Regions:
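C-terminal/domain-terminus segments
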Residues: 70-93
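Flexible, glycine/small-residue-enriched loop-and-beta-strand segment within the central core
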Residues: 1-71, 97-98, 104-106, 110-111
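Acidic/histidine-enriched, glycine/proline-rich intrinsically disordered or flexible terminal extensions
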Residues: 110-118
Length: 118
């Protein structure tokens, strides 16, 4: 299953060919911890909202969490268990928590071009 922020599903854009593996979460809201002050309760902290944009043919691995305000670029791959807190550029591999780009897949390099797409 994939958990989608249904209260704010209008903030989620998923283009054609996107793969989202099981146990992922797409969150369009989070508590704004930067606003935390001594004496505040968790319930007093404001929410921050942001759009999630999953571009054409990107892939989100099992158990990933995609946070608000993030774009995953065309053809990008996010490895299993990653927490995506910032944009992931097109044609890259991002891993970890928080997700960081560890590899690029140059579009003009034949090694990374599928024969099916030619």
């Amino acid at each position: 299953y994939v958990r989608v922020d249904l209260n704010h599903s209008d903030l989620i854009e998923i283009e054609d060919g996107v793969h989202i593996a099981g146990d992922c979460r797409l969150l369009c809201h989070k508590k704004e911890l930067a606003e935390y002050k001594q004496g505040m309760t968790y319930g007093m902290m404001p929410y921050k909202y942001g759009k999630i944009h999953l571009c054409k043919n990107c892939a989100i691995g099992t158990g990933c969490i995609v946070m608000p305000g993030v774009t995953v670029g065309e053809g990008a791959v996010v490895g299993a268990g990653a927490m995506v807190t910032k944009d992931i550029p097109a044609w890259t591999l991002a891993l970890g928590c928080p997700a960081k780009v560890v590899k690029e897949f140059p579009k003009d390099d034949p090694k990374y071009v599928s024969k099916k797409s030619q």
